[in-house]
């Protein structure tokens, strides 16, 4: 059986067993007034909770009200009905403990079943459900009147059980119940809507923060910062819904605070991004400044290169001009010697041993015959010696030409190397190319001239007019001319064998010079130019009136010259040459102490204290005491007031001490050559003096004065002796 739809009591199926019908009265503990009292306004959440509780207890409340209204009627009907049941079925017993437990289970079950009609009443809000229970009471009365029939009673009561109801209270109007249900429904719906809106708002806020964190960094690098504010702010529609749903001032204030926090976050991040960007730009500016400085230094170095090339071009041009002048002089000398030799060979009839036995015909034949005597005697030994001398001169000139050719070839190689090293478009390149072209032409001219020598006729005639036989003690005009050109050439003319040996040694020296040039990586034409300058200065130097002796090589090989020189001239003072030396005054300083300090720092990297006369005199005596031939030099030292002041201090402000020591060494070398024929004994003079004033370590820092001095010194007989000793 199913429950009756018009009954306020909940009827449930009891199962297949025949359960007794029990009518329960109102509960004594319930207060009808407390149930009918108006409820205070509550929050939406509490109203929803009470609504659910009311839904569960709805059936009980209605049944209690109905039972309270029809209390006397039900009591009468129950007694009548009980009597009928007892009369009809005397075997039915009162419920026992098992029935009580089953009754408890059934009491819990109708509560679940009774939720459905109560919830349907709330949703439909039908007013007839909340009306008074008078129809129900009538239905119960009709049921009680018809209960006299056994069949009807069995049909109506079998398997049914009535729930316990509450005490009936004051009935409420239907309109009041409908309004309360509607308010409760709206409260629950409003609370649900507010919670959904808050969830949507929270999700939008989280979404905005995510976009700000992950999208704001990438957009800050591209530049626009306004888009970050647009992405972070919530949608306008969502704000409107939030305000309409909440309807509370506190929620609006909270929303404003949230928006302010969201607005402040991107501003801080934008400031951090701007600071990072400024730091990067500052670093880039520093890098650009460093690059500009490097480019500036490179441009300055490139601008200084043409100046160096111009200086090198000028040096090479001067060396070329000197080589050309020396070549022209040698060519003229060689032509004269060839003409003289051919004239002698033409006028002389040679014998089996190669000697001139008879003079030929010619204008000079009579003169020769007169000089030799009317008997036609053989030529004197002086003539033969002069002939050999001329042959030696010719051979020496050939060797000198070959030497000049090799020197010009080395200069040409240096020029070609310079042209290769110089860059294209350099203004000095044209001058270097012109010098190389001129050198190549000179080399070809020398080769052609050596193969096809020209012999002018007037030269031989002029030579035949000169006397051929002169005293050995009186030098001939040719010898005087050679003395004006330079005493160093006579060594070649006198001794052919020694000339060839010296040529070999010179070749070895030249090879060493070439190796040095390759190691240094730059041309050393100035060395060759220094040699040529020395030769020209010696050749242009007039004969000295003081009668300075010839070099040691000529004195050793030809004692007659030495004897003649001693007979004709008085010996020079040992230190006389030192006073003729021209010194250059130091520049950029004033005062003895300042100039001495500047000189020491410039040449040795160490400050030089003013040199005292007594200290230098002691050093000179110590050095000269080691030389056996230097005894007379110690008697009168070259320490005149021209070099030292009244206080005995060297005049550093008038001449450099370094130049003074160089002059002393040159004078000692000349004296050594005159005494021993060798100048190697005094090569360590400078090192001895400078090591005392500066120390041994300072000698390594010298600016190359020794090499320059050797270049200027390698002229004359010493130029030939030094390589010969090394070889």
Swiss-Prot record:
Which regions are flagged for Basic and acidic residues bias?
Answer: 498-544, 551-568, 716-727
In the record, biological process GO terms are: regulation of DNA-templated transcription
Q: Which residues lie within the region annotated Disordered?
A: 1-135, 491-568, 701-727
Q: Where is the composition biased (Low complexity)?
A: 39-53
- Main subcellular location: cytoplasm
Q: Which residues carry this modification: Phosphothreonine?
A: 153
Described by its record, this protein's role is as follows: Regulator of pre-B-cell leukemia transcription factors (BPXs) function. Inhibits the binding of PBX1-HOX complex to DNA and blocks the transcriptional activity of E2A-PBX1. Tethers estrogen receptor-alpha (ESR1) to microtubules and allows them to influence estrogen receptors-alpha signaling.
> What is the annotated quaternary arrangement, including any partners?
Interacts with ESR1, PBX1, PBX2 and PBX3. Interacts with TEX11.
* Annotated domain remarks: The C-terminal domain (AA 443-731) contains a nuclear export signal. Association to the cytoskeleton through a N-terminal leucine rich-domain (AA 190-218).
| Name of the featured protein | Pre-B-cell leukemia transcription factor-interacting protein 1
